[in-house]
Amino acid sequence: MLNKNCKVEFELNDRELLIFIKGEIDHYSAVLVRGEIDAKIAEVRPKVAILVLSGIDFMDSSGIGLVMGRYARMQNVGGTLVVRDPSERVERILRLAGIERIVKIEKGDKDDEK
């Protein structure tokens, strides 16, 4: 747990890293989440990292930076990044920023939710 407003959990399936982020992504929490995710990516070097955003209640522009930075990090380790299950509001923010041009945004199975 990062703070009372944001929590991150990981699940590794083969070379696929599921990253469950819950709560609010603002400037403060994005810094903490970024560090934790980057450390896990460096540790396991996944082929695919999936940001599961179904638990995000609020996201500002810091969330866009979080996604863009993890995209670059995955490119550096030869992997890909996927955003899964953002709420309508979060998906709208991501699409307004043009994220879907470089990162796949998908709707996943509800079985993947933690």
Residue ranges with predicted function:
Residues 59:
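Conserved TIR/SEFIR loop-to-helix hotspot centered on a Trp-containing motif
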Residues 1-55, 72-114:
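STAS-like cytosolic regulatory interaction modules
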Residues 67-71:
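Histidine-anchored nucleotide/phosphate-binding helix
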